[in-house]
Amino acid sequence: AAGEVVERPASVIKELVENSIDAGAKNITVEIKNGGTTFMRVTDDGCGIYRDDIKVAFLRHATSKVKVESDLDSISTLGFRGEALASICAVSRLQLITRNVNEEIGTSYEIDGGEEQSFDDAGCPVGTTFVIRDLFYNIPARAKFLKKDVSDFCILFGFWKRFCERTYSG
């Protein structure tokens, strides 16, 4: 279920930032509005996603990190289960804008509640931008819970603090 990976805006940000790091990003920008319930954007300058791989990336258990079973013994990336993107797009209105380093033109892909809306060419730099709108719009009970929860900004801040300490210490 989508709730396994996506519990709140902070979990969306965590998953997308980890994807950015795994893509070799040197710069990652995170923007949120209303604690992330109405708008989140994560932009990176990583390698981008190949156009041919975009739709597959949103399928449950799809991952670019495991090619053969023995890869599971040597995973050095932050994410590998292939759950995050499928879960995020199932409970939000998602737009992906990406260009792989080996491609001349980028791609914009929009999904609304797990349903594809558009797949078009896009002029964009190498890297990836995820725009997440209306988190849990199609799960009213979860959306209502989040509207009452004013602590998500603190959770996001705590995630960033722990992440930076883990990544940049020593």
Where are these regions (language model features)?
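N-terminal phosphate-binding caps/lids of nucleotide- and nucleic-acid-binding domains
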Residues: A1-G170
